[in-house]
Amino acid sequence: MKKIVLLTLLASVLFFSFERLSKTQTKPENTEQDKGRPKLIALKFGEPDELTYDAGTVRFLATSVDTNGAWSLVELKEMPGYHTNLHRHNHTDEAFYVMEGVLTVKINDKFSDYPAGSYVLIPRGTPHAQGNRGKVPARILLTMTPGGFERSFKDRVDLFKTAKPSDPDFRQKRKENAAKGNYDVEFLADWDLPT
């Protein structure tokens, strides 16, 4: 008899504990606790659309708006012959994962080639430049921490609609856009890709 009473008591305690626990763990969506959390992002192959800019194409996979400024992720397809100016980001780390082709990176006056499967992390404040000296497009995943610098690619997409890299003042317009947009980029020098 004692066992039956004890088991009944234990079952009642467990039942009411689980019921109370489930009520406390259920909360309405978009509460104060949700502020500062990244949005859910679920993209299928080919989403979102590729946008054309002066280096090739860009796809915005996760923007700083999606991650509350924590980071951003873009997929770049850089065409052969494209290269950046020597520059640095004083507040942004950049991480490159090469998916196709070869990415050439200049750090501390040293050029290195990174084929598909390579990963390069450039800490904030490091002068660097990158480009594609190969014969095929280089497809790259670029993560920026914190987010925000991806907005510069949006401006470059918009600039490409009205101006082309062959225009004599194209690079100057790009620098001016970067300065206006406050993208944490400091241009240091022009350079040419080694052949």
Predicted segment positions?
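Glycine- and acidic-residue-biased ligand/ion/polar-headgroup-sensing regions
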Residues: 91-103, 108
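Short acidic-glycine-tyrosine-enriched beta hairpin
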Residues: 109-127
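A contiguous, mid-protein "functional segment" used to position or interact
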Residues: 135-181
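A short, N-terminal "cap"/entry segment at the start of jelly-roll beta-barrel domains
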Residues: 20-71, 165-195
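Bacterial Sec-dependent N-terminal signal peptides
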Residues: 1-26
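Ligand-binding loop in jelly-roll beta-barrel domains
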Residues: 69, 104, 124-150
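Conserved short histidine dyad/triad with adjacent acidic residue
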Residues: 59-60, 74-89
